[in-house]
Amino acid sequence: MEKPKTIHVDKPWGSFDQFVLNETCTVKILTCAPGQKLSLQKHRNRAELWVALDEGVIIELDGKLITPDRNAEVWLPAGSVHRLSCAAQTPHPVRVMEISLGHFDENDIERLEDVYGRH
């Protein structure tokens, strides 16, 4: 599965960004509190497009750390090892819009590391 092309459209009143068109997808807003992080994980049956909604987002993707600007997109191919985190010194929670493409199932998660003791 390839990253969908984001389309930017200017309008007289401003603009909009279209992330997917007529595709089956699941959209969530992930919120990560200061000093917290999600599981280091991967999914077999879905890829994800993450859009940073706030400054201070930290994404680990296949062993590399990414600190995207607000509104920046990060493509997580199916099978990629990833996690979201928020630095302890960040004065606010950080949010990412997650657009999951492929077969979405909350059980399609392989946790490789989890600070909360989940498997």
Short names for language-model regions:
Residues 2-10, 87-119:
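Double-stranded beta-helix
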Residues 4-46, 99:
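A short glycine-rich, His/Asp/Glu-containing loop-to-beta-strand
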Residues 38, 47, 57, 82, ...:
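Glycine-centered loop/turn positions within well-structured domains
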Residues 45-63:
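Glycine- and acidic-residue-biased ligand/ion/polar-headgroup-sensing regions
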Residues 55, 71, 96:
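Short hydrophobic/aromatic patches on the structural cores and recognition surfaces of FHA
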Residues 62-81:
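Short acidic-glycine-tyrosine-enriched beta hairpin
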